[in-house]
């Protein structure tokens, strides 16, 4: 079976192992077609060059996409010293080349230390960020450069896995909005050798460290029942939120848009995972003053 014509709602999260050479949106559309999903969205683009985890949200799961967009990510990347490109990766044109450079293992380690923690990063012109509604990469292809402001990012892990004097392999865990190819380029600049990224693989999105990814080929070869079994429950993406169990009457009230009294001890403004008495996921609520809760994003069914 290759595709399905779904007569029912498809709700859940698929952890897709995106192939190289495909845009995130193209991967989303192929997966959406395979599942026959009426509504779908991805949670953080991967460049065509990149592979790895691309969480896709189907149906009611699209209501929690923002939490996955905001989640930390972990990557494995390979950089090459000695040259820079206009895109900071191997798909671009070489704009700088240096033949005579020497970088020791100790120098590389010392340089990586400078990029750990909270740092500033200037996004590449070859990014999906927009200027007056136009993606920067489109402007870059027209030879237009726009001034970009440095942004705060956090590199929580930066580990050197391999280094042969030219190519270096890194494991990087970072906050949202981090451009790994820019990080690789900045490392090369600090070493005064230049560098560009040759490989990028997303290992996981926070919350899914131990979950399996599936390729499009694997999914296409599966029967429908097995394919649907690959979907992850919506609430697994928000396990970092405090869970709150509501009574049947409270579930009814909050679905009607009413504020309910539920002494959770949560901080005002804190998002909460809401469940019914039978542990069915209701959606996301928000804590108010005095422990009250209001609906923030409810699913339209009980899982």
Curated annotation (Swiss-Prot):
E.C. number(s) listed in UniProt: 5.4.99.25
One biological process term in Gene Ontology: tRNA pseudouridine synthesis
UniProt keyword list: Isomerase, tRNA processing
Keyword tRNA processing: yes
Active site: 47 (nucleophile)
Top-level EC class as recorded in UniProt: isomerase
Superkingdom of the source species: Bacteria
UniProt catalytic activity: uridine(55) in tRNA = pseudouridine(55) in tRNA
Keyword field contains tRNA processing: yes
Gene Ontology MF terms: RNA binding; tRNA pseudouridine(55) synthase activity
InterPro entries for this protein: PsdUridine_synth_cat_dom_sf, PsdUridine_synth_N, PUA-like_sf, PUA_sf, tRNA_psdUridine_synth_TruB, tRNA_sdUridine_synth_fam1_C, TruB_C
Function according to Swiss-Prot or TrEMBL: Responsible for synthesis of pseudouridine from uracil-55 in the psi GC loop of transfer RNAs.
Name of the molecule in the record: tRNA pseudouridine synthase B
Species classification: Bacteria, Pseudomonadati, Pseudomonadota, Gammaproteobacteria, Legionellales
Name of the gene encoding the protein in the UniProt record: truB
């Amino acid at each position: 079976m290759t595709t399905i014509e779904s007569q029912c709602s498809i709700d859940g999260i698929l952890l897709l192992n995106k192939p190289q050479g495909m845009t995130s949106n193209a991967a989303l559309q192929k997966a959406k077609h395979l599942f026959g999903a009426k509504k779908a969205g991805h949670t953080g683009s991967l460049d065509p060059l990149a592979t790895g985890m691309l969480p896709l949200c189907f149906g009611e799961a699209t209501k929690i996409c923002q939490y996955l967009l905001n989640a930390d990510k972990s990557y494995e990347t390979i950089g090459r010293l000695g040259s820079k490109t206009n895109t900071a990766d191997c798909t671009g044109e070489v704009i700088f080349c240096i033949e005579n450079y020497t970088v020791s293992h100790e120098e590389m380690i010392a340089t990586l230390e400078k990029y750990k923690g909270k740092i500033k990063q200037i996004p590449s012109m070859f990014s999906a960020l927009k200027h007056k509604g136009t993606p920067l990469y489109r402007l870059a292809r027209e030879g237009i450069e726009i001034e970009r402001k440095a942004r705060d990012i956090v590199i929580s892990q930066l580990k050197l896995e391999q280094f042969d004097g030219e190519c270096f392999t890194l494991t990087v865990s970072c906050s949202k909005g981090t451009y790994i190819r820019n990080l690789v380029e900045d490392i090369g600049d600090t070493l005064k050798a230049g560098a560009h990224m040759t490989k990028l693989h997303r290992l996981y999105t926070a919350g899914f460290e131990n979950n399996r990814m599936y390729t499009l080929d694997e999914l296409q070869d599966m029967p429908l029942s097995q394919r649907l079994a690959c979907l992850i429950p919506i609430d697994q993406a928000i396990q970092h939120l405090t869970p709150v169990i509501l009574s049947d009457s409270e579930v009814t009230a909050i679905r009607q848009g009413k504020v309910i009294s539920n002494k959770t001890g949560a901080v005002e403004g804190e998002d909460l995972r809401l469940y019914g008495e039978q542990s069915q996921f209701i959606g996301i609520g928000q804590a108010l003053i005095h422990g009250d809760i209001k609906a923030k994003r409810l699913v339209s069914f009980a899982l």
